[in-house]
């Protein structure tokens, strides 16, 4: 059995630290991609009293949130019409991505005789989604004056927040400042938000009315220097499995597909029942590390869909079937932390955690 053990205390402590750091700004907690792989329902259930909003990528994720909490939920992505009626009935916040979408929302709202809560996404330089910057004020004005929309928020997204010295950050901030000025001229109550985790840590003065700290809430820090208080944030999860078999190699034998790992006679290998079919990175095969009984062991051979093997050498520490295996550590400096795994596989912690799928059990402790 493969289990992602999540510390409720660490999760809640991370959010409390962030709330202290952002002052009076609201907190919108992103739980998209199954709460970055940690499990939407469990994460929402254990944090809803600490945050103001939740944010997700699509309608189906939003419904999973509203099933367990009453907080407002913002959908970042495009809304599919087969779900829009249920979204409106549950007061799920819709993102407006272009001017023309306002009229479509109004038509549906009239049919349901219910107003739609909306946030307008402005493209200030990410060039992915959102209303074009040059069309922003017209779109905001149109939505604000609509009889069928409640314009609750206006937001944008930083393209280069992970590089705090990138000139695009200033360009986007200046553009958003002009949008905020226009928006607040209509109503001081409209929530303006720009920053994700890297945004409000790397750029001073851009918390605005609300921040959206995703990866930081789950315990992953940017590499650049941040405030000492933020340094108290810790990863919330450990990925664990069990040794299911011990194999002793004979002379000249290898292990796994293509037998790329060739051991020595008498070498012992531990078989672990987790593989890329569980969302664990295949690239770790033959170069990653796991922790068994506080000893690090190297992976041996290619990772398969459902399993991997690690070399125990001569098994001087007497690893046995049934021993617990730590695949992802909650200690960032460890060789099997999400941070270290991301470095080894040339990706980011978001990727390592969010691709862990539902073959892995989530357990709040």
From Swiss-Prot:
Q: Which pathway does this polypeptide act in?
A: Amino-acid biosynthesis; D-alanine biosynthesis; D-alanine from L-alanine: step 1/1
Database matches in InterPro entries: Ala_racemase, Ala_racemase/Decarboxylase_C, Ala_racemase_C, Ala_racemase_N, PLP-binding_barrel
**Which SMART domains does the annotation name?**
Ala_racemase_C
Top-level taxon in the UniProt lineage = Bacteria
EC number(s) from the headed UniProt entry: 5.1.1.1
Tell me, what is one Gene Ontology molecular-function annotation carried by this entry? Answer: pyridoxal phosphate binding
Gene3D superfamilies in the record, alphabetically? Alanine racemase, Lyase, Ornithine Decarboxylase, Chain A, domain 1
Q: Which residues form the active site?
A: 32 (proton acceptor), 257 (proton acceptor)
Binding residues for substrate: 128, 305
* GO CC annotation: cytosol
Cofactors that this protein relies on: pyridoxal 5'-phosphate
Q: Name one GO biological process term.
A: D-alanine biosynthetic process
**Catalytic activity field:** L-alanine = D-alanine
Q: Which SUPFAM superfamilies match?
A: Alanine racemase C-terminal domain-like (SSF50621), PLP-binding barrel (SSF51419)
Residue list for modification N6-(pyridoxal phosphate)lysine: 32
Q: Does the keyword Membrane apply?
A: no
Spell out the coiled coil positions from the record. none
What Pfam families has UniProt attached to this entry? Ala_racemase_C, Ala_racemase_N
Keywords attached to this Swiss-Prot or TrEMBL record, sorted alphabetically, are:
Isomerase, Pyridoxal phosphate
The family note in this entry says: Belongs to the alanine racemase family.
What is known about what this protein does?
Catalyzes the interconversion of L-alanine and D-alanine. May also act on other amino acids.
Q: Which HAMAP family match?
A: Ala_racemase
> What is this protein's record name?
Alanine racemase
Protein's organism: Francisella tularensis subsp. holarctica (strain LVS)
Q: Which gene encodes it?
A: alr
């Amino acid at each position: 059995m493969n289990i992602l053990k999540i510390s409720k205390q660490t999760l809640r402590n991370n959010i409390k630290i962030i709330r202290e750091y952002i002052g009076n700004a609201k907190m919108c907690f992103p739980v998209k991609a199954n709460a970055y792989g940690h499990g939407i329902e469990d994460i929402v259930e254990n944090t809803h009293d600490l945050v103001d909003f939740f944010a997700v990528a699509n309608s189906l994720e939003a419904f999973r949130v509203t099933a367990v909490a009453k907080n407002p939920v913002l959908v970042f992505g495009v809304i599919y019409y087969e779900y829009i009626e249920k979204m409106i009935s549950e007061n799920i916040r819709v993102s407006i991505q272009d001017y023309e979408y306002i009229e479509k929302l109004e038509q549906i709202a009239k049919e349901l005789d219910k107003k739609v809560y909306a946030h307008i996404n402005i493209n200030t330089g990410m060039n992915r989604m959102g209303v074009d910057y040059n069309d922003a004020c017209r779109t905001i004005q149109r939505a604000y004056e609509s009889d069928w929309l409640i314009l609750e928020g206006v937001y944008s997204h930083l393209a280069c927040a992970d590089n705090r010295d990138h000139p695009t950050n200033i360009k986007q901030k200046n553009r958003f400042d002009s949008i905020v000025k226009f928006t607040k001229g209509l109503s001081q109550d409209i929530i303006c938000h720009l920053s994700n985790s890297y945004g409000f840590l790397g750029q001073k003065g851009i918390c605005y009315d609300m921040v959206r700290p995703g990866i930081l809430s789950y315990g992953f820090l940017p590499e650049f220097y941040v405030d000492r208080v933020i340094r108290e944030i810790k990863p919330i999860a450990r990925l664990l499995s069990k040794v299911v078999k011990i194999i002793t190699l004979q002379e000249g034998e290898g292990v796994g597909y293509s037998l790329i790992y060739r051991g020595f006679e008498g070498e012992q290998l531990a078989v672990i029942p987790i593989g890329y079919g569980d969302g664990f990175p295949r690239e770790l095969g033959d170069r990653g590390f796991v922790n068994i009984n506080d000893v690090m062991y190297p992976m041996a051979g290619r990772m398969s869909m459902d399993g991997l093997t690690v070399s125990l050498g001569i098994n001087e520490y007497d690893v046995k079937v049934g021993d617990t295996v730590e695949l992802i550590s909650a200690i960032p400096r460890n060789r099997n932390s999400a941070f270290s795994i991301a470095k080894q596989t040339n990706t980011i912690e978001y990727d390592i955690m969010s691709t862990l799928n539902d073959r892995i059990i989530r357990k709040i402790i």
